[in-house]
């Protein structure tokens, strides 16, 4: 069985402090060339898309262009997600031809660093060049219901570089070949992640046996997720987690530095998680707090009411 996506955290450090992004409590770390080579060998032939983050800003890693080239040569389709503030140091990426680059434009309003026009000029120069070389570029405004006052100005600045008409899509617009603008709601992280939640609890989550606590009412909910079937996550210390939302390593199933992927996926805890979702049950407290896993809700698409 081919897993669709693997999120490899090449660094867990970020240069911004966005209000919508949870804060992890792990030691700062980035992958070495040898570690990245080992991890990609472990999932080679078993994963289609390789994402270069789980937490952290991938453009901070000095070996990112080399990593993208290594991954492409091993047969992966490479995907980068960035806040777009460091694109001036990422021009070498244009020659590595990533499959897709996603830029989170909503990070600017959350941090208010520098002029929006300067930020967007950098974003659009890079994006149009990358799209021209064949990389799929996605400009994301995932802030509906949150800090979205700059959205209209962002769209006006985009139009300076890519004039209308734009082709409307269910989630936004196709601006031109290989360049898209995408809208969505403010993301809700599981486990009470995010700045507001961590401020209220001084960075500590309610615990039960070392894991996130869950409300008794959660047991009445129905859950479904394709974690471990369609996606996996790998933290910068090699820990394998079920999905891209386990930002703090609450559900560590094994370590790819020391174990094979098959061994980890065959473990009792991993099997229980997969089997639970087959019966619309969530065995892990983190999953019980995840909006994306609720059967009666859909994260993408319509606005939350």
Kindly give the residue locations of the regions a language model identified.
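Conserved alpha-helical substructure of the radical SAM core
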Residues: 1-100, 110-118, 297-300
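N-terminal pre-core extensions flanking Radical SAM catalytic domains
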Residues: 1-27, 41, 202-203, 209, ...
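Short, functionally important structural connectors and interaction interfaces within domains
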Residues: 6, 23, 47, 51, ...
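Radical SAM enzyme [4Fe-4S]-AdoMet core and its adjacent flexible, acidic
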Residues: 31, 74-77, 93-264, 272, ...
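Alpha-helix N-cap/helix-start and coil->helix boundary motif
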Residues: 65, 87, 258, 270-271
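Short, charged low-complexity intrinsically disordered segments located at boundaries
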Residues: 71, 75, 150-160, 287-304
């Amino acid at each position: 069985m081919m897993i669709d996506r693997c999120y490899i955290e090449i660094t867990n450090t970020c240069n911004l402090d966005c209000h919508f992004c949870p804060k992890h409590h792990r030691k700062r770390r980035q992958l070495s060339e040898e570690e990245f080579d080992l991890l990609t060998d472990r999932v080679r032939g078993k994963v289609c898309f390789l994402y270069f983050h789980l937490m952290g800003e991938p453009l901070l890693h000095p070996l990112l262009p080399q990593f993208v080239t290594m991954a492409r040569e091993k047969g992966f389709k490479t995907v980068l997600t960035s806040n777009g503030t460091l694109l001036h140091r990422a021009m070498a990426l244009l020659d590595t031809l990533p499959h897709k680059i996603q830029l989170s434009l909503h990070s600017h309003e959350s941090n208010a660093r520098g002029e929006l026009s300067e930020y967007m000029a950098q974003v659009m120069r890079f994006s149009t060049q990358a799209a021209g070389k064949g990389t799929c570029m996605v400009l994301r405004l995932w802030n509906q219901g949150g800090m979205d006052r700059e959205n209209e100005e962002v769209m006006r600045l985009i139009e300076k570089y890519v004039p209308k008409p734009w082709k409307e899509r269910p989630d936004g617009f196709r601006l031109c070949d290989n360049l898209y603008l995408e809208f969505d709601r403010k993301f809700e992280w599981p486990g009470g992640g995010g700045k507001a939640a961590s401020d209220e609890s001084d960075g500590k989550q309610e615990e039960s046996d070392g894991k996130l606590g869950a409300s008794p009412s959660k047991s009445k909910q129905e859950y479904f997720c394709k974690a471990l079937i369609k996606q996996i996550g790998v933290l910068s210390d090699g820990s394998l987690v079920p999905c891209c939302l386990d930002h703090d390593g609450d559900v560590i199933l094994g370590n790819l530095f020391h174990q094979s992927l098959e061994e980890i996926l065959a473990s009792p805890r991993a099997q229980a998680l997969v089997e639970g979702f087959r019966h619309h049950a969530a065995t892990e407290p983190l999953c019980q707090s995840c909006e994306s896993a609720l059967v009666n809700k859909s994260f993408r698409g319509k606005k939350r009411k």
